[in-house]
Amino acid sequence: MPSVAAAIIAGGPARRLGGATKPLLEIGGQAVADRQLAVLRPIFSRLLVVAGDPAPWRARGVEVVPDRVTGAGPLAGISAALAAASDQEAVVCLAGDLPFLSPALLTALRDRAPEAEALAPRPAGRAEPLCARYAVRARATVDARLDGGRLALHELLAELGTVWLDDQTLAALDPGGLSFFNLNTPDDLRRAEEIARRAP
């Protein structure tokens, strides 16, 4: 089995959520970060968090990596994760505001198409670059785009010749389709609370 780490790209303050740090928002009485780590720990032997402030993560026992370039968005987080995990074959990079990750989807991202430079879901034709696996050998491409100010993740996936997980595959791995539900607005937070209340 290939050696694959997982990295939470924590991101900066969320302007539309009052400047909150998204992974520390509570859903169903539990921080999003703790929900994510509970799902990730049984699947990945190495976990990283790319974050500007290491303090909230120390108590969670996670290796914290600083962004390589500040103000460059999630591409800088992916670059930092690949650099920190140079002893691995790949890194599954995840946005820090995904509270309902499917273990089956994460396992598929770890294991499938190990030769691919990138493996990413594409539900309804829409790529999900922050719930995707990137080969460590793709770091040169990532860094060249970062250094050149070409920060769009969808363009990165196109350049890498990504292997895609299509709708049929995703329906089997994540029947509820909630893995890509993220937190951008107060309405998203309210809906997430409703989903958490309904969860078994």
Language-model regions, residue ranges each:
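Nucleotide and nucleotide-moiety/phosphate-recognizing core
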Residues: 1-179, 190, 194-197
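Conserved active-site and cofactor/substrate-binding residues in soluble primary-metabolism enzymes
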Residues: 187
